[in-house]
UniProtKB/Swiss-Prot annotation:
Residues 1-32 form a transit peptide. It comes from Eremothecium gossypii (strain ATCC 10895 / CBS 109.51 / FGSC 9923 / NRRL Y-1056) (Yeast). GO terms for cellular component: mitochondrial chromosome; mitochondrial nucleoid. This is Mitochondrial genome maintenance protein MGM101. Pfam families: Mgm101p. Belongs to the MGM101 family. It comes from the Eukaryota. It is found in: Mitochondrion matrix, Mitochondrion nucleoid. InterPro entries: Mgm101. GO terms for molecular function: DNA binding; single-stranded DNA binding.
């Protein structure tokens, strides 16, 4: 509750002055105002007299219910005559096979040194190796990933659909996904989402197809991999992990 004290007349010699009303604030009102100010600081990110935009706001509130990347339709995107809108088009899908040299490069067996294995025993090809194979087959600039949807951000996941276009024709469409743990990790997760979509699209070209062949997987593990009991340095828990025979146990295991 706010009270206003009555004005007082002050006589000083020949002059008369009117004192301004004095505003007195009750203790309860002071506490309420302080609480409101603290809430505003947490919301807007005010630190002392500085305003730090964006801090203290949740991702959901910051996006305002919108997706991370807005649809470009009608937003200044101009399609020239003869161009293809890869967000919707299936231009060239299954229209014609690639030249024989391209197919030979795509079907080439993977080098054993290029294949990695995860601690749980899953074989995989690093994402950069997929890009190198595409560059050898189609040439640098002869292929690309075109987004087919908006970037969807959930509480723990980033996902987006991409199309792989090679020599002007659609080859494959796949949805990439990537987990994240804090809001500042979203930009990195969007790149991981793109890499995941690239790997899935390359399956339709036959790149690294042996990684899904049970016979090859068993043979590769027997020749190039081994299982070892290790201890986690932090939790001190012991477990069995897979690793290549030419590799050493790395952190966080010993």
């Amino acid at each position: 509750m706010i009270r206003f004290c009555s004005a007082r007349l002050i006589q000083r010699g020949l002059h008369t002055a009117v004192a301004k009303p004095v505003m007195a604030t009750s203790t309860a009102a002071s506490r309420a105002a302080a609480s409101k100010m603290a809430g505003a600081q947490a919301e807007t990110g005010v630190v002392g007299s500085r305003l730090v935009p964006g801090y203290g706001r949740t991702l959901t509130r910051a996006l305002g219910g919108q997706v991370l990347e807005a649809d470009t339709e009608g937003g200044g995107h101009v399609m020239t005559e003869g161009s293809v809108d890869w967000r919707r088009s299936f231009h060239g899908l299954g229209a014609k096979p690639f030249a024989a040299p391209v197919q030979e490069e795509l079907a080439r067996a993977l080098e054993p040194l290029d294949i990695e294995i995860k601690p749980d025993g899953l074989l995989y090809l690093p994402e950069i190796k997929y890009r190198r194979i595409l560059n050898r087959a189609f040439g640098a600039g002869g292929w690309g990933l075109a987004p087919r949807s908006d970037t969807i951000v959930t509480a723990k996941l980033v996902t987006r659909e991409y199309a792989l276009v090679c020599h002007g024709q659609l080859v494959s469409v796949a949805r990439g996904e990537q987990d994240y743990f804090i809001d500042t990790g979203i930009p990195t997760a969007t790149e991981g989402c793109k890499s995941n979509a690239l790997m899935r699209c390359c399956k339709d070209l036959g790149i690294g197809s042996e990684l899904w062949d049970p016979v090859f997987i068993k043979k590769f593990k027997k020749e190039y991999c081994m299982e070892r009991f290790v201890e986690h340095l932090t939790t001190k828990k012991k477990k069995k992990i897979w690793l290549r025979k030419d590799r050493e146990v790395e952190y966080p295991y010993k």
